[in-house]
Curated annotation (Swiss-Prot):
<keyword id="KW-0560">Oxidoreductase</keyword>
<dbReference type="InterPro" id="IPR026992">
    <property type="entry name" value="DIOX_N"/>
</dbReference>
<keyword id="KW-0408">Iron</keyword>
<dbReference type="InterPro" id="IPR005123">
    <property type="entry name" value="Oxoglu/Fe-dep_dioxygenase_dom"/>
</dbReference>
<dbReference type="GO" id="GO:0016706">
    <property type="term" value="F:2-oxoglutarate-dependent dioxygenase activity"/>
</dbReference>
<dbReference type="InterPro" id="IPR050231">
    <property type="entry name" value="Iron_ascorbate_oxido_reductase"/>
</dbReference>
<feature type="domain" description="Fe2OG dioxygenase">
    <location>
        <begin position="197"/>
        <end position="306"/>
    </location>
</feature>
<feature type="binding site">
    <location>
        <position position="297"/>
    </location>
    <ligand>
        <name>2-oxoglutarate</name>
    </ligand>
</feature>
<feature type="binding site">
    <location>
        <position position="232"/>
    </location>
    <ligand>
        <name>Fe cation</name>
    </ligand>
</feature>
<dbReference type="InterPro" id="IPR044861">
    <property type="entry name" value="IPNS-like_FE2OG_OXY"/>
</dbReference>
<protein>
    <recommendedName>
        <fullName>Probable iron/ascorbate oxidoreductase DDB_G0283291</fullName>
        <ecNumber>1.14.-.-</ecNumber>
    </recommendedName>
</protein>
<comment type="similarity">
    <text>Belongs to the iron/ascorbate-dependent oxidoreductase family.</text>
</comment>
<keyword id="KW-0479">Metal-binding</keyword>
<dbReference type="GO" id="GO:0046872">
    <property type="term" value="F:metal ion binding"/>
</dbReference>
<feature type="binding site">
    <location>
        <position position="230"/>
    </location>
    <ligand>
        <name>Fe cation</name>
    </ligand>
</feature>
<keyword id="KW-0223">Dioxygenase</keyword>
<feature type="binding site">
    <location>
        <position position="286"/>
    </location>
    <ligand>
        <name>Fe cation</name>
    </ligand>
</feature>
Length: 363
Protein backbone atom coordinates (compact mmCIF):
# COMPACT_ATOMS: atom_id res chain seq x y z
CA UNK A 1 0.00 0.00 0.00
CA UNK A 2 1.43 3.37 -1.00
CA UNK A 3 0.64 6.97 -0.21
CA UNK A 4 1.57 9.99 -2.28
CA UNK A 5 3.65 12.56 -0.40
CA UNK A 6 3.14 16.22 -1.29
CA UNK A 7 4.19 19.46 0.33
CA UNK A 8 1.52 20.86 2.63
CA UNK A 9 1.20 24.64 2.84
CA UNK A 10 1.03 26.18 6.32
CA UNK A 11 -2.25 28.06 6.13
CA UNK A 12 -5.32 28.22 8.37
CA UNK A 13 -8.95 27.96 7.33
CA UNK A 14 -11.18 30.68 8.85
CA UNK A 15 -13.04 29.92 12.09
CA UNK A 16 -16.43 31.67 12.18
CA UNK A 17 -18.49 32.06 15.36
CA UNK A 18 -22.15 31.82 14.32
CA UNK A 19 -23.68 32.15 17.78
CA UNK A 20 -26.44 34.76 17.68
CA UNK A 21 -27.44 37.25 20.36
CA UNK A 22 -30.69 37.78 22.22
CA UNK A 23 -32.54 40.76 20.79
CA UNK A 24 -33.47 41.36 17.16
CA UNK A 25 -31.11 44.29 16.51
CA UNK A 26 -28.10 42.45 17.87
CA UNK A 27 -29.02 39.33 15.94
CA UNK A 28 -29.42 41.19 12.63
CA UNK A 29 -26.09 42.95 13.12
CA UNK A 30 -24.40 39.65 14.00
CA UNK A 31 -25.89 38.00 10.90
CA UNK A 32 -24.42 40.71 8.68
CA UNK A 33 -21.00 40.39 10.30
CA UNK A 34 -21.08 36.60 10.09
CA UNK A 35 -22.22 36.74 6.46
CA UNK A 36 -19.26 38.96 5.60
CA UNK A 37 -16.92 36.39 7.13
CA UNK A 38 -18.68 33.64 5.18
CA UNK A 39 -18.35 35.65 1.96
CA UNK A 40 -14.60 36.01 2.46
CA UNK A 41 -14.22 32.33 3.35
CA UNK A 42 -16.25 31.13 0.35
CA UNK A 43 -14.37 33.36 -2.09
CA UNK A 44 -10.91 32.52 -0.78
CA UNK A 45 -11.20 28.92 0.44
CA UNK A 46 -14.63 27.38 -0.15
CA UNK A 47 -14.12 25.99 3.37
CA UNK A 48 -14.49 27.31 6.90
CA UNK A 49 -14.92 26.12 10.47
CA UNK A 50 -17.95 27.13 12.52
CA UNK A 51 -18.27 27.34 16.28
CA UNK A 52 -21.19 28.47 18.42
CA UNK A 53 -23.38 26.20 16.28
CA UNK A 54 -25.66 25.04 19.09
CA UNK A 55 -25.28 21.29 18.54
CA UNK A 56 -24.88 19.60 21.93
CA UNK A 57 -21.41 18.09 22.36
CA UNK A 58 -22.94 15.25 24.38
CA UNK A 59 -25.00 14.23 21.33
CA UNK A 60 -21.89 14.26 19.14
CA UNK A 61 -19.87 12.28 21.67
CA UNK A 62 -22.65 9.71 22.06
CA UNK A 63 -22.94 9.23 18.31
CA UNK A 64 -19.18 8.90 17.97
CA UNK A 65 -19.07 6.29 20.73
CA UNK A 66 -21.96 4.26 19.26
CA UNK A 67 -20.51 4.50 15.75
CA UNK A 68 -17.18 3.11 16.90
CA UNK A 69 -19.02 0.23 18.54
CA UNK A 70 -20.94 -0.46 15.34
CA UNK A 71 -17.81 -0.54 13.18
CA UNK A 72 -16.08 -2.82 15.69
CA UNK A 73 -18.78 -5.47 15.18
CA UNK A 74 -18.03 -8.64 13.27
CA UNK A 75 -18.13 -8.11 9.52
CA UNK A 76 -20.96 -10.62 9.13
CA UNK A 77 -23.13 -8.50 11.42
CA UNK A 78 -22.40 -5.26 9.59
CA UNK A 79 -23.23 -6.94 6.30
CA UNK A 80 -26.80 -7.48 7.55
CA UNK A 81 -27.27 -3.76 6.78
CA UNK A 82 -25.44 -3.65 3.43
CA UNK A 83 -26.53 -1.06 0.89
CA UNK A 84 -27.81 -3.57 -1.66
CA UNK A 85 -30.71 -4.39 0.66
CA UNK A 86 -32.05 -0.82 0.61
CA UNK A 87 -32.33 -0.83 -3.19
CA UNK A 88 -33.18 2.64 -4.56
CA UNK A 89 -33.06 4.27 -1.12
CA UNK A 90 -29.26 3.90 -1.39
CA UNK A 91 -28.84 3.45 2.37
CA UNK A 92 -26.79 1.08 4.48
CA UNK A 93 -23.31 -0.27 5.08
CA UNK A 94 -20.38 -0.58 2.68
CA UNK A 95 -17.09 -2.36 3.29
CA UNK A 96 -13.56 -0.94 3.39
CA UNK A 97 -12.63 -0.13 -0.20
CA UNK A 98 -16.24 -0.41 -1.34
CA UNK A 99 -16.49 3.26 -2.30
CA UNK A 100 -14.55 4.69 -5.25
CA UNK A 101 -13.16 8.15 -5.97
CA UNK A 102 -12.01 8.68 -9.57
CA UNK A 103 -12.16 4.91 -10.03
CA UNK A 104 -9.82 4.16 -7.11
CA UNK A 105 -10.76 2.57 -3.80
CA UNK A 106 -11.03 4.74 -0.69
CA UNK A 107 -9.64 3.28 2.53
CA UNK A 108 -12.78 3.59 4.60
CA UNK A 109 -16.00 1.80 5.46
CA UNK A 110 -19.25 3.53 6.20
CA UNK A 111 -22.97 3.89 6.63
CA UNK A 112 -25.11 5.76 4.12
CA UNK A 113 -28.10 7.41 5.77
CA UNK A 114 -30.57 10.21 5.18
CA UNK A 115 -33.91 11.70 6.10
CA UNK A 116 -36.18 8.88 7.28
CA UNK A 117 -39.11 8.59 4.86
CA UNK A 118 -41.82 5.96 5.30
CA UNK A 119 -43.15 3.83 2.46
CA UNK A 120 -46.26 6.04 2.13
CA UNK A 121 -44.24 9.20 1.45
CA UNK A 122 -45.00 10.57 -2.06
CA UNK A 123 -41.33 10.50 -3.10
CA UNK A 124 -41.00 6.90 -1.97
CA UNK A 125 -44.23 5.89 -3.71
CA UNK A 126 -42.81 7.52 -6.86
CA UNK A 127 -39.68 5.36 -6.38
CA UNK A 128 -37.45 8.43 -6.31
CA UNK A 129 -33.84 7.29 -5.87
CA UNK A 130 -32.07 8.16 -2.59
CA UNK A 131 -35.32 8.50 -0.66
CA UNK A 132 -36.76 6.02 1.82
CA UNK A 133 -36.03 4.23 5.06
CA UNK A 134 -32.61 3.79 6.60
CA UNK A 135 -31.29 0.32 7.40
CA UNK A 136 -31.14 0.33 11.19
CA UNK A 137 -30.65 -2.48 13.69
CA UNK A 138 -33.84 -3.38 15.53
CA UNK A 139 -34.13 -2.55 19.22
CA UNK A 140 -33.40 -6.19 20.02
CA UNK A 141 -30.27 -6.04 17.84
CA UNK A 142 -29.16 -2.79 19.48
CA UNK A 143 -29.35 -4.56 22.84
CA UNK A 144 -27.55 -7.63 21.53
CA UNK A 145 -24.75 -5.58 19.93
CA UNK A 146 -24.46 -3.10 22.82
CA UNK A 147 -25.38 -0.10 20.66
CA UNK A 148 -28.65 0.87 22.37
CA UNK A 149 -29.85 4.25 21.10
CA UNK A 150 -27.96 4.05 17.79
CA UNK A 151 -31.02 4.71 15.60
CA UNK A 152 -32.48 7.45 17.79
CA UNK A 153 -29.12 9.18 18.17
CA UNK A 154 -28.53 9.18 14.41
CA UNK A 155 -31.99 10.56 13.62
CA UNK A 156 -31.66 13.25 16.30
CA UNK A 157 -28.28 14.27 14.91
CA UNK A 158 -29.61 14.41 11.34
CA UNK A 159 -32.56 16.56 12.46
CA UNK A 160 -30.44 19.05 14.41
CA UNK A 161 -27.71 19.42 11.80
CA UNK A 162 -30.32 19.78 9.04
CA UNK A 163 -31.77 22.74 10.97
CA UNK A 164 -28.25 24.12 11.25
CA UNK A 165 -27.95 23.74 7.48
CA UNK A 166 -31.06 25.88 6.95
CA UNK A 167 -29.55 28.60 9.16
CA UNK A 168 -26.23 28.49 7.33
CA UNK A 169 -27.94 28.75 3.94
CA UNK A 170 -29.69 31.91 5.16
CA UNK A 171 -26.30 33.37 6.09
CA UNK A 172 -24.87 32.35 2.72
CA UNK A 173 -27.81 34.05 0.97
CA UNK A 174 -27.21 37.25 2.96
CA UNK A 175 -23.50 37.05 2.08
CA UNK A 176 -24.54 37.28 -1.58
CA UNK A 177 -26.82 40.28 -0.89
CA UNK A 178 -29.87 38.10 -1.44
CA UNK A 179 -32.95 37.71 0.73
CA UNK A 180 -32.40 35.27 3.58
CA UNK A 181 -34.96 32.86 2.11
CA UNK A 182 -33.47 32.87 -1.40
CA UNK A 183 -32.31 29.24 -1.33
CA UNK A 184 -35.15 27.86 0.78
CA UNK A 185 -37.79 29.41 -1.49
CA UNK A 186 -36.21 27.85 -4.57
CA UNK A 187 -34.16 24.77 -3.72
CA UNK A 188 -33.88 23.78 -0.07
CA UNK A 189 -37.28 24.12 1.60
CA UNK A 190 -37.34 20.33 1.40
CA UNK A 191 -33.63 19.57 0.95
CA UNK A 192 -32.15 16.25 -0.01
CA UNK A 193 -30.20 15.26 3.10
CA UNK A 194 -27.44 12.71 2.58
CA UNK A 195 -25.73 11.74 5.82
CA UNK A 196 -22.71 9.50 6.21
CA UNK A 197 -20.82 7.91 9.08
CA UNK A 198 -17.33 6.99 7.90
CA UNK A 199 -14.73 4.86 9.63
CA UNK A 200 -11.14 5.06 8.38
CA UNK A 201 -9.21 2.03 9.69
CA UNK A 202 -5.66 2.73 10.75
CA UNK A 203 -2.93 1.26 8.58
CA UNK A 204 0.09 -0.54 10.00
CA UNK A 205 2.97 -0.87 7.55
CA UNK A 206 5.86 -3.24 8.23
CA UNK A 207 8.13 -4.16 5.33
CA UNK A 208 6.03 -5.73 2.62
CA UNK A 209 3.18 -6.62 4.98
CA UNK A 210 0.24 -4.27 4.64
CA UNK A 211 -2.48 -4.59 7.23
CA UNK A 212 -5.04 -2.51 9.02
CA UNK A 213 -5.80 -2.72 12.70
CA UNK A 214 -8.93 -4.66 11.81
CA UNK A 215 -8.61 -6.35 8.45
CA UNK A 216 -6.31 -7.22 5.59
CA UNK A 217 -6.86 -6.59 1.90
CA UNK A 218 -5.80 -8.41 -1.25
CA UNK A 219 -5.93 -5.20 -3.29
CA UNK A 220 -4.00 -2.79 -1.10
CA UNK A 221 -1.59 -1.65 -3.80
CA UNK A 222 -4.29 0.48 -5.44
CA UNK A 223 -5.17 2.41 -2.28
CA UNK A 224 -3.49 5.79 -1.92
CA UNK A 225 -5.93 7.85 0.15
CA UNK A 226 -8.57 7.54 2.82
CA UNK A 227 -10.63 9.51 0.29
CA UNK A 228 -9.17 10.70 -2.99
CA UNK A 229 -9.37 14.25 -4.31
CA UNK A 230 -12.94 15.33 -5.02
CA UNK A 231 -15.51 18.07 -4.63
CA UNK A 232 -18.93 17.67 -3.03
CA UNK A 233 -22.02 17.70 -5.21
CA UNK A 234 -24.66 19.83 -3.49
CA UNK A 235 -24.69 23.26 -1.88
CA UNK A 236 -23.28 22.76 1.62
CA UNK A 237 -21.46 20.08 3.61
CA UNK A 238 -21.34 20.12 7.42
CA UNK A 239 -18.62 17.81 8.72
CA UNK A 240 -17.75 16.56 12.18
CA UNK A 241 -14.37 14.86 12.46
CA UNK A 242 -12.88 13.18 15.52
CA UNK A 243 -9.44 14.07 16.90
CA UNK A 244 -7.41 11.83 14.54
CA UNK A 245 -7.28 14.28 11.62
CA UNK A 246 -6.29 13.77 7.99
CA UNK A 247 -8.54 16.17 6.05
CA UNK A 248 -6.71 18.27 3.44
CA UNK A 249 -8.08 21.17 1.37
CA UNK A 250 -6.71 22.55 -1.88
CA UNK A 251 -6.35 26.31 -1.38
CA UNK A 252 -5.06 28.85 -3.88
CA UNK A 253 -1.56 28.29 -2.47
CA UNK A 254 -1.60 24.49 -2.45
CA UNK A 255 -2.81 21.72 -0.16
CA UNK A 256 -3.45 22.71 3.46
CA UNK A 257 -4.45 20.65 6.49
CA UNK A 258 -7.86 21.11 8.11
CA UNK A 259 -7.13 19.61 11.54
CA UNK A 260 -9.84 18.81 14.10
CA UNK A 261 -10.74 21.74 16.36
CA UNK A 262 -12.83 20.85 19.40
CA UNK A 263 -16.35 22.25 19.34
CA UNK A 264 -16.38 23.03 15.62
CA UNK A 265 -17.75 21.72 12.37
CA UNK A 266 -15.97 22.05 9.04
CA UNK A 267 -18.22 23.50 6.32
CA UNK A 268 -17.63 23.59 2.60
CA UNK A 269 -19.61 24.54 -0.46
CA UNK A 270 -20.47 22.09 -3.21
CA UNK A 271 -20.78 22.02 -6.98
CA UNK A 272 -24.34 23.33 -7.10
CA UNK A 273 -23.51 26.46 -5.10
CA UNK A 274 -20.50 26.95 -7.36
CA UNK A 275 -22.88 26.70 -10.32
CA UNK A 276 -25.49 29.03 -8.79
CA UNK A 277 -22.91 31.72 -7.98
CA UNK A 278 -21.24 31.55 -11.38
CA UNK A 279 -18.00 30.39 -9.80
CA UNK A 280 -17.88 33.26 -7.30
CA UNK A 281 -18.05 30.67 -4.51
CA UNK A 282 -15.98 27.69 -5.63
CA UNK A 283 -16.50 24.06 -4.66
CA UNK A 284 -13.02 23.29 -3.41
CA UNK A 285 -11.18 19.97 -3.92
CA UNK A 286 -10.34 18.08 -0.75
CA UNK A 287 -9.12 14.64 0.30
CA UNK A 288 -8.34 12.52 3.35
CA UNK A 289 -4.94 11.00 4.04
CA UNK A 290 -4.45 7.32 4.74
CA UNK A 291 -4.88 6.89 8.47
CA UNK A 292 -1.59 5.91 10.11
CA UNK A 293 -2.50 7.04 13.61
CA UNK A 294 -2.76 3.57 15.14
CA UNK A 295 -6.50 4.03 15.82
CA UNK A 296 -9.54 4.33 13.63
CA UNK A 297 -10.79 7.73 12.45
CA UNK A 298 -14.49 8.64 12.53
CA UNK A 299 -16.18 11.44 10.58
CA UNK A 300 -19.80 12.51 10.05
CA UNK A 301 -20.43 14.50 6.85
CA UNK A 302 -23.97 15.76 6.32
CA UNK A 303 -24.61 16.89 2.76
CA UNK A 304 -27.28 19.59 2.64
CA UNK A 305 -28.36 19.38 -0.98
CA UNK A 306 -30.98 20.96 -3.24
CA UNK A 307 -34.27 19.16 -3.62
CA UNK A 308 -33.84 16.13 -5.88
CA UNK A 309 -36.31 17.48 -8.45
CA UNK A 310 -35.06 21.09 -8.46
CA UNK A 311 -33.24 22.74 -11.36
CA UNK A 312 -30.35 24.85 -10.02
CA UNK A 313 -29.60 27.87 -12.20
CA UNK A 314 -27.20 30.78 -11.97
CA UNK A 315 -28.23 33.61 -9.65
CA UNK A 316 -28.91 36.85 -11.48
CA UNK A 317 -27.54 40.19 -10.34
CA UNK A 318 -24.63 39.06 -8.16
CA UNK A 319 -20.94 39.78 -8.59
CA UNK A 320 -19.50 38.23 -11.75
CA UNK A 321 -16.09 36.65 -12.28
CA UNK A 322 -14.25 36.44 -15.60
CA UNK A 323 -13.56 32.73 -15.87
CA UNK A 324 -16.31 30.70 -14.27
CA UNK A 325 -15.39 27.58 -16.25
CA UNK A 326 -12.59 25.95 -14.24
CA UNK A 327 -12.93 22.52 -15.86
CA UNK A 328 -9.31 22.54 -17.05
CA UNK A 329 -8.09 22.58 -13.44
CA UNK A 330 -10.89 20.61 -11.79
CA UNK A 331 -10.15 17.12 -10.50
CA UNK A 332 -12.78 15.63 -12.87
CA UNK A 333 -12.38 18.18 -15.72
CA UNK A 334 -16.14 18.73 -15.71
CA UNK A 335 -17.70 22.12 -16.44
CA UNK A 336 -20.49 22.31 -13.89
CA UNK A 337 -21.66 25.60 -15.42
CA UNK A 338 -22.59 23.86 -18.65
CA UNK A 339 -24.79 21.27 -16.94
CA UNK A 340 -28.49 21.49 -17.73
CA UNK A 341 -30.90 19.30 -15.83
CA UNK A 342 -32.24 18.55 -12.38
CA UNK A 343 -30.07 18.16 -9.34
CA UNK A 344 -31.21 14.54 -9.15
CA UNK A 345 -29.83 13.87 -12.63
CA UNK A 346 -26.49 15.43 -11.72
CA UNK A 347 -26.30 13.51 -8.46
CA UNK A 348 -27.18 10.10 -9.91
CA UNK A 349 -24.50 10.49 -12.55
CA UNK A 350 -21.93 11.27 -9.85
CA UNK A 351 -22.83 8.60 -7.30
CA UNK A 352 -23.07 5.98 -10.01
CA UNK A 353 -19.31 6.33 -10.41
CA UNK A 354 -18.79 5.90 -6.66
CA UNK A 355 -20.70 2.58 -6.55
CA UNK A 356 -20.87 1.46 -10.21
CA UNK A 357 -21.94 -2.11 -9.44
CA UNK A 358 -24.65 -0.97 -7.06
CA UNK A 359 -25.95 1.54 -9.60
CA UNK A 360 -26.24 -1.17 -12.24
CA UNK A 361 -28.13 -3.43 -9.84
CA UNK A 362 -30.60 -1.07 -8.15
CA UNK A 363 -31.01 2.19 -10.10
Amino acid sequence: MTSKIENITIEQLPIIDIESYGNDKEEELKKKLISKEIENACKNFGFFYIKGHGIDQELIDRLERLSKKFFSLDQSIKMKYRMELAQKAWRGYFVVGGELTSGLKDWKEGLYLGTELNDDHPLVIAQTPLHGLNLFPTLEEEIEYDIVGFKDTILTYIDKVTKLGHSLMELIAISLNLSADYFSSRYTKDPLILYRIFNYPSIISSGDDNKTTGESSDDNDKVEWGVGEHTDYGVLTILYQDDVGGLQVHSKNGWISAPPIKGTFVCNIGDMLDRMTGGLYRSTPHRVELNRSGRDRISFPLFFDPNFNSYPTEIEGIEQIENKDDSSSRWDHFNIHSFKGSYGQYLLNKIGKVFPDLKNNVL
